[in-house]
Amino acid sequence: ASRGLGDVYKRQHLIRENERAGKLDLLCASIPDPEAAAQAQGLQHTKMLYVAKPRGVRRYYPMVFLERCFGVAAPYDPWYQKVQLSLALELPTPDLIVAEGGTLTQCSAISKMFGKRRCLAHLHGQTSCSHEMDAIYGGILALSEFIRDDYLKTSELDRKHAYILHNCIDTARFVPGPADAALRASLGFAPEDFVVLFCGRLEPDKGIHKLLEAMENIHDPRIKLLIVGSPFFGRTQQSPFLRKLEQQAETLGDRVRFTGYVPNDSMPEYYRLADLVCVPTLVEEAAGLVAVEAMGCGRPVLATRSGGMPEYLDGSQAVLVDRDGNVAGQLSFAIRMLYEHPDLRAQMSTAGVKTAQRYSSARFYDDFVRIVYDFGGHLWNSPSSV
């Protein structure tokens, strides 16, 4: 079952690679999506199971907010009830069920119907386990060692069933190339400018305000900042935090540019026009795909030492700074240092491109299939339906 935008991104990679290799029969349960339905026409190894939201479901989501923030138990989501019935009719005995996103405890009835040993939870971020989670899932897929180890601190799950499935990018799109001079000029950057790029949601956890503080400590007018993103995915609405960022940036004048939301399909061009990509996350980052995409495009990366970030950047020669009381000071020092050492940036670029190749969609698919065989080996001689 899949309900999140990030889930869809990974699901597309999985479906595309499975159409090429044909090692699995996939049944994807999701809310109705006309665009996805059109794209699914002609698939040989994947079937889409669209389950509409039942009436009254809007009253459920405020309860989910209370559960996540204050521990107040939410009732059973009626959407999952419909998924359970649809699965029973469509595929009476699935070999394996992978829960993607949403509230993972909502799969309890599905687990009881098909068996805990057929159920895997795909953890996209830090997740605290509970007795209920342990009762529902016989295994997990974690985006990084950090996410896996953090989950196991509160779980009784056997470590051998806690799998690592690193995220992936489209390595055919995120590749090195020349900067788009017209795009760079349209954003107000001169050829001699040193452009630092931030890409992500504009919220405090992402640390963009600390990067702006770092820019305030840098007085070279040629060092500039490009901020790509918005407070909400795919939207351009204002937020109180964005207004604060814009006020903070006023002191820097034309050294800061805001683009608003940019679709992922256009991001390679933005990465390539930058001289340095900064990921100043202040919380535990599950994976850090922005950094991987930037490396794929040959851009050196400066990031905070958070969550799974060091794991994903291992071998890339990326510069990592600690999340202490002087994040802005560390960032400004690192930016100036990299600005003054183009030879070091070139080495980081070469190493980063090589590192990014580890996160291809083909590798993601092969790892997924390997996990399916390992986790479900006791249920079948060879995997078929997931």
Task: Name the predicted role of every residue range.
Residues F114, S239-Y261:
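Nucleotide-activated donor-binding/catalytic signature segment of Leloir-type glycosyltransferases, i.e.
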Residues A1-Y9:
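Single conserved hydrophobic/aromatic residue that forms the stacking wall/gate
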